[in-house]
């Protein structure tokens, strides 16, 4: 399997052969401060730098906010590396959107003036009025960017995003099955956080759910997708499943979720909860000569920063899986080693 639909069918990927734009929405939630909830950073202090560093890597092929690249505590590299290779090979334009960052990136970006998300284990995530304002601003961004392309590809980077995604799914009355950046998904810890968080949800109205248990990146992605006048590829895993369920309750969007096979084969995740078709791509990292890349096949990291979506687009544009892996390894050698 290099590319296959795991739910439904869609022509959106075909559109990516024409004019496409990649939009990376980045932000932070203080939920990432809960010990053991995420490994999206080499240590707790560095977690807040992961989203801006991911965005910098996509533009420059190196990070400016931190030394090296975002990695797990034992050195497994950010999925931004895969997205970087795909963007380089396809020449698709990149736009970065700040939706609630703690640390702004050292690159040009669009700012939605979104709040940082609060720790959903302790309080409501965001002020409802703020969420509504950010959503409207994001719709404007989506509308304008969609004029440049036949399809908008939207990715995300937010540590602890799978935890807020689980809370959103639960608050919407769905099974809170989400993936993790670790092979041993801290399911029990997430479940406790989610149970505590959903007690604050007053209704299953999507804006209320977002405000109570979501995160600012969800607001940005949902708004951009809702504002787009063209079809959308939601480039991500279970976080995009949660966002897709919010979007489907807020308006009409022609969308498909594109993720990696590592999420699709994760027993703790449930992509069938998506209201839109889902396609999974295999970046072939299991065949890599580098342990840091093979780790993806072993259940580490899995997805993020639009990696699965951009791999799918690269394949749709005729880049062979063998060539793609070769180029990812070249970038890994230059950027990581």
Curated annotation (Swiss-Prot):
Gene3D superfamilies: 3.40.50.10210
Spans traversing the lipid bilayer: none
A GO term for molecular function: nicotinate-nucleotide-dimethylbenzimidazole phosphoribosyltransferase activity
A Pfam family annotated for this UniProt entry: DBI_PRT
InterPro entries: Nict_dMeBzImd_PRibTrfase, Nict_dMeBzImd_PRibTrfase_arc, Nict_dMeBzImd_PRibTrfase_sf
Protein family according to the UniProt entry: Belongs to the UPF0284 family.
PANTHER family, sorted: PTHR38811, UPF0284 PROTEIN SLL1500
Protein's UniProt name: UPF0284 protein AF_0276
């Amino acid at each position: 399997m290099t590319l296959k639909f795991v739910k439904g069918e869609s022509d959106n990927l075909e559109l990516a052969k024409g004019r496409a734009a990649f939009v990376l929405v980045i932000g932070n939630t203080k939920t990432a401060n809960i010990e053991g909830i995420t490994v999206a950073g080499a240590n707790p202090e560095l977690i807040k730098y992961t989203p801006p560093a991911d965005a910098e890597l996509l533009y420059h092929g190196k990070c400016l906010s931190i030394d090296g690249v975002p990695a797990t505590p034992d050195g497994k590299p950010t999925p931004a590396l895969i997205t970087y290779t795909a963007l380089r090979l396809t020449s698709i334009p990149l736009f970065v959107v700040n939706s609630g960052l703690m640390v702004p990136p050292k690159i040009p970006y669009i700012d939605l003036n979104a709040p940082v998300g609060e720790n959903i284990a302790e309080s409501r995530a965001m002020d409802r009025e703020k969420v509504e304002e950010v959503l409207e601003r994001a719709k404007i961004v989506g509308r304008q960017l969609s004029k440049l392309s036949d399809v908008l590809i939207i990715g995300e980077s937010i540590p602890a995003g799978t935890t807020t995604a689980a809370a959103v799914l639960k608050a919407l009355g769905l099974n809170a099955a989400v993936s993790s950046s670790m092979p041993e998904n801290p399911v029990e810890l997430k479940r406790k956080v989610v149970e505590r968080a959903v007690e604050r949800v007053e209704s299953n109205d999507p804006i209320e759910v977002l405000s109570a248990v979501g995160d600012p990146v969800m607001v940005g992605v949902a708004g951009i997708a809702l504002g787009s006048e063209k079809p959308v590829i939601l480039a991500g895993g279970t976080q995009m499943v949660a966002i897709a369920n919010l979007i489907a309750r807020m308006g009409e969007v022609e969308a498909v979720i594109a993720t990696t096979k590592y999420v699709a084969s994760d027993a703790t995740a449930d992509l069938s909860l998506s209201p839109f078709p889902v396609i999974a791509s295999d970046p072939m990292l299991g065949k890599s000569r580098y342990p840091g890349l093979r780790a993806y096949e072993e259940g580490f990291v899995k997805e993020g920063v639009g990696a699965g979506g951009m791999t799918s687009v690269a394949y749709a544009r005729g880049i062979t899986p063998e060539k793609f892996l070769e180029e990812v390894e070249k970038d890994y050698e230059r950027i990581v080693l």
